[in-house]
Amino acid sequence: ILRCLVGSEMCIRDRVFTVPEELNPIIYSNQKLLYDALYHAASSTLNELAKDSKYLGADIGYICILHTWGSAMNYHPHIHTIVLGGGLDKDSKWKDTGGKFFLPYGFIAKVFRGKYLCELKSLWNDSKLEFHGTAEKYQNHYCFKELLGECYKKDWVAYCKETFNGAQSVINYLGKYTHRIAISNHRIKSMTEATVTYAVKDYKNKGQWKEKTVPGEEFIRRFLMHVPPKRFVRIRHYGLLSCRNKSKKMAHCRNLLGCKKYISALKNRSATEMIKLLYNIDVCRCSSCGGKMVSHLPDKHTPSVLAHMRC
């Protein structure tokens, strides 16, 4: 899909859609349904506002990625949307607003709020929701209505996290950020028979790293909260970047903008060349003597073993 992105001339942004923490219990009890609702609300918001001539008046393309965690592995479901900086108008001509993002931050959050809560209410009315743990009280009509009222009063957050310049920066972002899990090994600092200590970002202190220690069972509980439902698709493509449109319409966009098609630096490379290019590790060089390694295959009289490298 990323080979369909245009070159360095196009501005690409990461728009983040979040929900208030009051919804966390009911979302966690209905992960598949209410994660899908996040995608529905985010995509409907972007499509509707982008097509409005007051903002852009064009069909846009974007990628949606679900994240469910905060730095401390707390439950924080939100959607990242990587949005092209323009789109095709009704005459199939490219239209953008220069370097400025075409949708107002405050208004987009209000539209997203309305669409998400509308789908949530519809699911409740159709008795499609389950209620577990602290969400059990929302089976009651009055409690659920009170929850909706609280969420409508709140200012939801839909902010622009990062601006990309061209396809390569998007690829770097996707590779390093969107495909990660709730925590990586290097953040786990120490453990005992009873506790685990790991690094978290303190956003109240300018994003400084600090260490947090929790019981082992609590660490496992936090990690398992972020295992997605079976066969759940976390990365989804829409508009100009959808599978149906990406080949023809993105080629048309490149022609209109005079951009070169992105060609991966890894194309037609061998596995050893890819490792060298990505990690600067030469697997064909002996780590002990520095000599060049060659493949060594055993002869027919030697017990069958895998081929290995020798210098």
Question: Across the structure, where does each feature detected by a protein language model lie?
Answer:
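Single conserved hydrophobic/aromatic residue that forms the stacking wall/gate
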Residues: 1-12
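Short cysteine/histidine-rich metal-coordination sites, predominantly Zn2+-binding motifs
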Residues: 8-9, 300-311
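Signature for HUH/AEP ssDNA processing cores
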Residues: 13-38
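Conserved His + Asp/Glu catalytic blocks
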Residues: 25, 34-64, 71-200, 204-242, ...
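Short Cys/His-rich Zn2+-coordinating modules
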Residues: 258-276
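Residues immediately within or flanking Cys/His clusters that coordinate Zn2+
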Residues: 283
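Short, cysteine/histidine-rich loop/knuckle motifs that typically chelate Zn2+
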Residues: 287-288
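Short Cys/His-rich "knuckle" micro-motifs
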Residues: 294-299
